[in-house]
């Protein structure tokens, strides 16, 4: 559970028509995207052992009953690279873009990008906090910001 109000960011730049949007109807990922829309980072685990499953499995997975739970929203930069060329035209306005693998406090490693920080300020092990970027009225993307700026009451 998070102990603070979620932070929602909006972009001043209109969403590029080629921006890849997730399939919100995908039955495996639907709870993740619904949670993000509510400002919650949801992860999946086994109900009995609390063993984390990321990426998530279908709920009918045979080995053990699964459940979604609200993660702390805190993590550290496990790995990163700075993109100076857009991998899609939709990301041109974000360059240079710090792409990262964030390891959450719970142990999930999420591929993401970092916001509210300069590329030269990113480092391995950097504490980060999830923030939510509103892409459309239906799609909200969990992204990550340095924990220091998040804790200072940053609002975007």
Regions found by a protein language model. Give the residues of each.
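A broadly conserved sequence feature marking short terminus-proximal activation segments
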Residues: 1-41, 145-147
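Short, conserved secondary-structure segments in the cores of folded domains
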Residues: 32, 67-68, 100, 118
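Cys/His-rich short segments
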Residues: 34-74
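A short, acidic/glycine-rich surface segment
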Residues: 61-63, 84-89
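Residue-level marker of beta-strand positions
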Residues: 74-76, 127
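Short, conserved beta-turn/loop elements at beta-strand boundaries and strand-helix junctions
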Residues: 80-86, 133-137
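Short, basic/aromatic beta-hairpin or loop at an interaction surface
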Residues: 94-110
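Well-ordered alpha/beta subsegment
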Residues: 107, 111-156
């Amino acid at each position: 559970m998070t102990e603070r109000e979620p932070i929602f960011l909006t972009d001043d730049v209109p969403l590029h028509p080629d921006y890849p949007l997730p399939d919100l109807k995908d039955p495996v990922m639907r709870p993740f995207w619904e949670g993000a829309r509510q400002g919650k980072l949801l992860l999946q685990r086994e109900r009995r052992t609390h063993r984390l499953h990321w990426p998530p499995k279908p709920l009918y997975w045979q080995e053990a009953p699964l459940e979604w739970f609200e993660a702390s929203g805190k993590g550290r930069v496990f790995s990163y690279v700075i993109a100076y060329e857009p991998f899609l035209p939709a990301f041109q306005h974000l360059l240079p873009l710090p792409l990262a693998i964030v390891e959450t406090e719970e142990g999930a490693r999420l591929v993401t990008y970092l916001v509210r920080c300069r590329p030269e300020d990113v480092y391995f092990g950097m504490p980060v906090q999830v923030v939510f970027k509103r892409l459309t009225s239906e799609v909200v993307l969990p992204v990550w910001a340095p924990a220091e700026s998040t804790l200072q009451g940053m609002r975007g």
